[in-house]
Amino acid sequence: MNEQAKLERVFAYPFGDIYGNYVAKVERKGHTRDELDDVLGWFIQLSSEEIHAAAESGKTLREFFSDLSLTPHAELITGKVCGVRVEEVEDELMRRIRMMDLLVDELARGK
């Protein structure tokens, strides 16, 4: 499978599935869904209700991010996810997904 096909496979993943995984991860680490919603809400500029509606909508990650404006401070999000520096990810959509992953990882670790 070539690199673009791998990206397209990720982009087609339902946001609701990712959100469910995020909830399980932060709760396993002693944090709450509300804390997760606060972090995601800051990043993607949505309320908890809007995040929940998006999770239930069946939207893919591509569809989910196409409707959003990120925080104006998104460029300050730096670090590694799965050994990859998020600020160096070339594909804009994948960079946004990796930034979201990084924020959830940091919440789970208590940062």
Set out the residue ranges of the language-model regions.
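A charge-rich, low-complexity, intrinsically flexible signal that marks solvent-exposed coils, linkers
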Residues: 1-111
